[in-house]
């Protein structure tokens, strides 16, 4: 799970 700019990635 990490965020970069306006894109967020859930821990899946």
Curated annotation (Swiss-Prot):
Abdominal perisympathetic organs. Transmembrane segments: none annotated. One of its GO terms (biological process) is neuropeptide signaling pathway. Pfam families: Periviscerokin. The keyword Secreted applies. The modification Valine amide is found at residue 12. InterPro entries: Periviscerokinin (IPR013231). It is found in: Secreted. One of its GO terms (cellular component) is extracellular region. Keywords: Amidation, Neuropeptide, Secreted. Mediates visceral muscle contractile activity (myotropic activity). Belongs to the periviscerokinin family. This is Periviscerokinin-2.1.
